[in-house]
Every structure is written in C-alpha cells, then in structure tokens.
Amino acid sequence: FNYTKLGTIIALAGANFFKSINIGLIPLMIIFILFSAFMNLFMGSASAKWNILAPVFVPMFMLLGYSPELCQLAYRIGDSCTNIITPMMTYFAVIITFAQRYDKKAGIGTITATMIPYSVAFLVCWTILFAIWILAGLPIGVNTGLFYPMG
C-alpha cells in the first residue's frame, strides 16, 4: 500500500461514497462488522487481517469523523464472532481432536454446524451491545471518544 498509495485512494473513495449516501454511524459500523466477520472465514490470523484492513478503513473512518479506536472495536467484534466456524483458525484441528473423544465421527462439518448458531448469536448480541454503546455515547477507553475531531 505504501508504494502504490492504493490504501489512501480506496480510503478517500470510500469516505466520499459513504458521505454521498449519508449513511449513519450505526449502519456503517454494522456493515464493517459483517465485512470483518466474512473476511475472518477466509483468513485466520487477526493481526494479518488488521494489517490489510487498517490502512484502508482507519483513514476512511477518520475522514468520516470517527475515531480509529472505534474502527478497531468494530473490527474485533466481527473478527471474534466467526473464529470458531472458520477452518482457517489455528486451533481448529485441536478442537476437532477434542470433539472426536466424544464423537468418533466428528469432523469439520460437525464442528462448524454445531457452532454456527453460537457464532450468529454472538454476532447479533455483540452488535446490539455495540449499537447501544454508541447511542449512549460512552467512551471506548481512557481519553478515547467515539469521534475524531476534524481540523
């Protein structure tokens, strides 16, 4: 991204697009949470995903007036909820091995099918809690707000 400046170009284009459609904070964060959850199904490493997504989404959200911490919080919600259903997870083989102690036929499909309802429930509950947090205007951390002061 440094050589081509593609991250900056995508961030500017994305910020302009979201400004033009006048999307609110909560719908934007829900879209980002779902995108993060979807990306997690294909890439297991949270830090590698963040290294790919952060150069685009952090500046994009900052241009929209939202703090980088808010962006990372939304990313972590989406990322954490689908960890158990992605075969790309580092410990997926270990989980299958433990499950096979109790059911010799357990495999990838068994674990994924068993965990999808939990994953969806976590995703829905965390997203609702996140929306309530935003509506309440609570800070994310010490000296950290939801919004990024422009100029």
Language-model features: where?
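Short, surface-exposed helix-loop/turn micro-motifs enriched in polar/charged residues
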Residues: 6, 48-49, 69
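Re-entrant/interfacial helical elements at transmembrane boundaries that shape
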Residues: 10-13, 47-60, 89-102
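Transmembrane helix-bundle signature of multi-pass membrane transporters/permeases
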Residues: 33-37, 55-56, 72-84, 112-120
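Juxtamembrane and boundary regions of transmembrane helices in multi-pass small-molecule transporters
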Residues: 80-151
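Short amphipathic alpha-helical coupling elements at transmembrane boundaries
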Residues: 9-20, 58-63, 110-113
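Core transmembrane alpha-helical segments of multi-pass membrane transporters/permeases
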Residues: 1-9
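Membrane-interface alpha-helices at helix entry/exit sites of multi-pass transporters
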Residues: 26, 65-74, 103-114
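Hydrophobic alpha-helical transmembrane segments of multi-pass integral membrane proteins
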Residues: 19-59, 64, 76
